[in-house]
């Protein structure tokens, strides 16, 4: 596994802590924003408690993404599973995904830690992403995650953004 440092993504939204928390911990919330632009998810299981399981399909649904996936010889959807390993309601969660859908790459775990910090009418969301198996995949991970955050910016409006 890569010795690269964790990636840090921070956004501040004009939303409530409960609204953002529900996006991470409910089926409807998760399906409403998870996945980069051009993709959607279908949640099959979400048990948002310590040790609980998250299972979903990531599905290319925009014509340009479908064409790109087909051109690369990649499937249009893949099954994803993870485990909630830490939950402090409306404050912090840790979600560990099993990365077992990359051709030619041994399965491994990728962890993300999400924290919420209320500030007046806004909430700052800080997400720490563990690096993927190589720098290029880590770059793509950050790009994809940043893309899906655009869905939240459209929904709530973003006050301030930062990534490292």
How does the language model describe each region?
Residues 1-41, 45:
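Hydrophobic ligand-binding cavity/cleft-lining segments
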Residues 154-164:
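Short, highly charged C-terminal tails/helix-capping segments
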Residues 20, 30, 54-56, 84, ...:
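Hydrophobic pocket/interface hotspot
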Residues 85-86, 92-146:
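Beta-strand/loop substructures that line and gate deep hydrophobic ligand-binding cavities in soluble
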Residues 42-96:
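Glycine-rich portal/gate segments that line the openings of hydrophobic small-molecule binding cavities
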Residues 3, 48, 73-78, 104-108, ...:
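A generic structural micro-feature
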Residues 8, 41, 77-81, 107-112:
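Short, surface-exposed coil-to-beta transition loops
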